[in-house]
Amino acid sequence: MSKKTKQELENNKLSKRLRHAVGDAINDFNMIEPDDKIMVCLSGGKDSYALLDILRQLQASAPIDFELVAVNLDQKQPGFPEEVLPTYLESIGVPYKIVEEDTYSTVKRVLDEGKTTCSLCSRLRRGILYRTAKELGCTKIALGHHRDDILATMFLNMFYGGKLKAMPPKLVSDNGEHIVIRPLAYVKEKDLIKYAELKQFPIIPCNLCGSQPNLQRQVIGDMLRDWDKRFPGRIESMFSALQNVVPSHLADTELFDFAGLERGQTLKHGGDLAFDSEKMPERFSDGSEEDESEIKIAPQKAERKVINILANKPKTCGA
């Protein structure tokens, strides 16, 4: 097999892996429904480019119809190349809107020199995007956070906030007006890096964020990458844990009625079993066999009809 052919096979495997990971997340959390109008938030980074690209692929083949509109917030950062995103979006034929709001000056004016800008910048950006989604009549807002972002958020909350809280794949906004989805929830960052190289996306660096050393999120990210390198499978196991929460073995009295425990009561996950098998669900394993009686992923709630986004469009009459 030639080197070129081998690389093509690897590229095809990568594209298929990403498409199925996104499709699985959409299916598991019922992220996309018939006739949705989805606002895809495009920053110019690798993650949001990949999100838009994969959603376009699914839009072309899915058994339901949904709209996509790309939205970029031009925050008026010095040196921001304003022409890059419009040129790219016009070249691929995606409807888009560029929203111009000078949040850069606001952040610089409000915060003291040397303070990290991410928190305030994020809040300002979120409010503007919610407003834009309402103006466009969008039913969903799609963000480009991936699996590693979700885990990093969990550790940020644990280490610095005293909360066991991550980043949900799907949520309702604080004002209750918007459904926010994260279709890349099952996708590894290292796969997104490879995909961006493969697709040659015109990446726009975030100078405002990149100029800030020792950010807490950056430190956590370095920790996760180090673990992934030194302990293969650890990241997969940690993400699996987010889908296998056992409230009776934590210490939150609002999640579990410890005060009401009685003798003879049977707990769903065992009363005194503190450490379970090291096996992980098949989705995150290396493909080896597992005992399904020991590992269960996200027990089914009340039955809901969910469209399989990875299925094909129905054939039209005469086709």
UniProtKB/Swiss-Prot annotation:
GO-annotated cellular components: cytoplasm
The enzyme's E.C. designation: 2.8.1.-
A GO BP annotation: tRNA thio-modification
Catalytic activity annotation: cytidine(32) in tRNA + S-sulfanyl-L-cysteinyl-[cysteine desulfurase] + AH2 + ATP = 2-thiocytidine(32) in tRNA + L-cysteinyl-[cysteine desulfurase] + A + AMP + diphosphate + H(+)
Pfam families reported for this sequence: ATP_bind_3 (PF01171)
Highest taxon listed in the record's lineage: Bacteria
A GO MF term: tRNA binding
Metal-binding recorded as keyword: yes
The record's free-text note on cofactor binding: Binds 1 [4Fe-4S] cluster per subunit. The cluster is chelated by three Cys residues, the fourth Fe has a free coordination site that may bind a sulfur atom transferred from the persulfide of IscS.
Segments traversing the membrane: none
Cofactor(s) the protein needs: Mg(2+); [4Fe-4S] cluster
Sequence motif PP-loop motif, residues: 43-48
Matching InterPro entries: Rossmann-like_a/b/a_fold, TilS/TtcA_N, tRNA_Cyd_32_2_STrfase, tRNA_thiolation_TtcA_Ctu1
Disulfide cross-links: none
Primary role: Catalyzes the ATP-dependent 2-thiolation of cytidine in position 32 of tRNA, to form 2-thiocytidine (s(2)C32). The sulfur atoms are provided by the cysteine/cysteine desulfurase (IscS) system.
Record text on subunit structure and interactions: Homodimer.
Alphabetical list of NCBIfam families matching this protein: PRK10696.1
Family, per entry: Belongs to the TtcA family.
HAMAP family according to UniProt: TtcA
Note: The thiolation reaction likely consists of two steps: a first activation step by ATP to form an adenylated intermediate of the target base of tRNA, and a second nucleophilic substitution step of the sulfur (S) atom supplied by the hydrosulfide attached to the Fe-S cluster.
UniProt protein name: tRNA-cytidine(32) 2-sulfurtransferase
Higher taxonomy: Bacteria, Pseudomonadati, Pseudomonadota, Betaproteobacteria, Neisseriales
Gene it is expressed from: ttcA
